[in-house]
Amino acid sequence: MGSAIVAALRVAGVPATGPHGRGYDGAGDAVVLLCVPDDAIGVAAQQIVPGPLVGHCSGASGLDVLGDRSGMSVHPLMTVTRQGADFAGVWAAVAGSDRAALAIASSLATTLGLRPVRVDDADRPAYHAAAAIAANFLVTLESAAAELMSTAGLDREVLVPLATAALQNWARSGPSALTGPVARGDTGTVALHRRVVAERTPHLVGLFDALVGASQRLAAADSTPGSGIGSAEPGTTGPGSGSTGSGSAATTSAP
């Protein structure tokens, strides 16, 4: 993450340095962004000298991990690979210990091309858990489907168009995008599916049952008049444009 952020800031004309390693203390920098594992944020923050505004890129952690100093956070809601990242149009959770820190976090996000949305510390665990379900568990789910498909002699690539279309439909329609035997109330087919899962991939029965139950509740809610299922407006965004502070910005990738 640190390398991707530094590269994007330089493209935007911000005099960013780094990523820095162990022993970096932030002397001479106006803003220091800690791009380290969650468990290392506190130790890394303690190494920064007084003066710079210190932030982190964790989605699950609050500002308390930075100690008593003024702090901020910017968490791009995306997956960053070794090939880099395109931050344009991606949502980012921002927070600040005061108005000035929040303004800098929001300005940093917009400079990167991100869309800042304020997420308070109390809501961070729920925010990050939802992100994990949407991204990490999606891979687990599709891998389970591919494993079962392989017992029919077919590769996972046959599932890609189906999975892609389902995700695109959900993006457009939300819960109403649910299709298939559970949505139709076809209990016979659901029972047939469960039997073959139990026979060929018995370790997936628990996952299958949980997904059927969740899908049944979703289908029932979607078919209830006045259920109110639909899209929701994004959360409140933080302050928009503003300076990221005088001097240079820096990121550190290790405590």
Please name every model-derived segment.
Residues I5, A85-A171, A214:
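Internal alpha-helical scaffold of NAD(P)-dependent oxidoreductase catalytic cores
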Residues A12, Q47-G51, T111, T151, ...:
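Alpha-helix C-cap/termination motif
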Residues S3-R10, R22-A85:
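Rossmann-like NAD(P)(H) cofactor-binding subdomain of soluble oxidoreductases
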Residues E157-P255:
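NAD(P)-dependent Rossmann-like dehydrogenase/reductase catalytic/cofactor-binding core
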Residues G13-T17, V54, G71, P116, ...:
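Hydrophobic anchor at the start of a short beta-strand
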Residues A60, G67-S70, L77-R82, D86, ...:
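Predominantly flavin-linked oxidoreductase catalytic cores and closely associated redox partners
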